Amino acid sequence: MKLLMDTHIWVWSLLETDRLSHGVSKALADPANEVWVSPISVWEVLVLCQKGRLVLQPDAMAWMSGALLRVPLKEATLTHEVALATGQVAPHHPDPADRFLAATAKVYGLTLVTSNCNLLAGKGFSVLANR
């Protein structure tokens, strides 16, 4: 299975593993699965740190550089096709970052791993619920 972690799942997988369900933990650890991250999640972590909603040590840039090297992840490149697909998967979702993640899952044929109720109700892409 090809899994795209949403931003919260990515951060929790590194910092708060107890927030992951047994099924999600198992899927992320399964070597048969590919685990992907979007540059949108990297950007979103930076924004959360700038707003003071997330604190990473020693700082956001160093933490993310280390996190991206420590855990082998595939990068879901942001493309024009992904941007255009945001209007198909969750056109009324209020969070643009979430719309990009849903569109990325659709375009790349990935399963979006999320706890977000709005994303779990999305159309045109598969999800793995963190419940």
How does the language model describe each region?
Residues M1-V37, K51-G66, R70, Y108, ...:
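Short, well-structured N-terminal submotif of metal-dependent ribonuclease cores
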Residues V45:
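Phosphate/NTP-binding elements of NTP-utilizing enzymes
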Residues V55-M61, L69-C117:
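Active-site neighborhoods of divalent-metal-dependent phosphate/nucleic-acid chemistry enzymes
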Residues A76-T77, V127-N130:
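Short acidic-hydrophobic, aromatic-tinged amphipathic segments that line or gate anion-handling sites
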